């Protein structure tokens, strides 16, 4: 298994008691995309990017739809606003935590 400690550390900056199994599941879900700097980050200022997060991970993996997904995404953007480079893994973890759908990951 790959060393995901960098992701655990980043998630730990925003969430207490990190569920490493959930982080591992997100890393596996994202797969090879995490190798690309651009694809490994989420831009909260780009509505197209947030739409992809909503229609992809939030909908397909977490089962969120419509307003519930949009509210959770907005809450995560607010929580991470001081971090200029928002890690996709951390963003997805916080999205699951915010929406109460962590069980879909671990």
Locate the predicted segments by residue:
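Core of compact, soluble alpha-helical bundle domains
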Residues: 2-63
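Absolute protein N-terminus
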Residues: 1-2, 106
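Short amphipathic alpha-helical segments and their helix-coil junctions
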Residues: 4-13, 65-82
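Residue-level detector of well-ordered alpha-helical segments, enriched
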Residues: 22, 26, 49, 68, ...
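Short, compact, well-ordered microdomains
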Residues: 71-106
């Amino acid at each position: 298994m790959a060393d995901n400690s960098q992701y655990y550390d980043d998630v730990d900056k925003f969430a207490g008691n990190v569920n490493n199994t959930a982080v591992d599941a997100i890393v596996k879900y994202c797969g090879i995309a995490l190798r690309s700097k651009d694809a490994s980050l989420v831009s909260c200022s780009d509505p197209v990017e947030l739409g992809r997060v909503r229609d992809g991970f939030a909908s397909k993996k977490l089962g969120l739809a419509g307003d519930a997904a949009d509210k959770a995404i907005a809450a995560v953007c607010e929580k991470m606003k001081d971090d200029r480079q928002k890690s996709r893994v951390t963003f997805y973890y916080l999205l699951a935590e915010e929406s109460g759908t962590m069980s879909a990951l671990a």
